[in-house]
Amino acid sequence: MIGRLRGVLTSKTPPWLVVDVCGVGYELEVPMSTFCELPDVGYEVNLFTHYTQKDDSAALYGFLSESERRLFRHLQRVSGIGTKIALAILSSVSVDTFAGLIQAGDANALTVIPGVGKKTAERMLVELRDRAADFNNGISTSGKLNLDTVSEAALALQQLGYKPAEAARMARDAGTESDDVAIVIKKALQTVLR
């Protein structure tokens, strides 16, 4: 239907935005990972899209990368996961990190994501394990220990008052090769203070 939009960003209020394409304003809902990377209003954007039609409503979702959209679509096929949880997952972790968690079989790390409980995490592991390479472009992700460290750091940042999605993003962006949670937290907080 609508696979991609390129136009001028005219409105931006999390998690919604409006993109003007030749005089038509398309309203899209985007994950916070996409929202945080968008330019200011008035600049051109290029987004991959996913259109859904339900009984009484239609919705358009936007993503910066093809791999984000691909993961969103794979998540929609998992029993019990709707658009809200799929967006929460994409807002909390990168595609590569998520693929690494699936490949490592780490249900506990998945439960850190808002809206994902133990049963949902286990269901995702079962239903997505064979497809993990599909949504991260075949990139091999290593470091289960590093992913555990990032998850622990995200939990610690939540305890400091950061919202779950923001804490997950901060920990992911600060993730290092170190297995020391304190180092990841320190790096995340230093980035915020700059």
Swiss-Prot record:
Residues 145-194 are annotated as: Domain III. Residues 65-140 are annotated as: Domain II. Residues 1-64 are annotated as: Domain I. Residues 140-144 are annotated as: Flexible linker. GO terms for molecular function: ATP binding; four-way junction DNA binding; four-way junction helicase activity. Transmembrane segments: none annotated. It is found in: Cytoplasm. GO terms for cellular component: cytoplasm; Holliday junction helicase complex; Holliday junction resolvase complex. Has three domains with a flexible linker between the domains II and III and assumes an 'L' shape. Domain III is highly mobile and contacts RuvB. Belongs to the RuvA family. HAMAP family: DNA_HJ_migration_RuvA. This is Holliday junction branch migration complex subunit RuvA. It comes from Xylella fastidiosa (strain Temecula1 / ATCC 700964). The lineage of its organism: Bacteria, Pseudomonadati, Pseudomonadota, Gammaproteobacteria, Lysobacterales. The gene is ruvA.
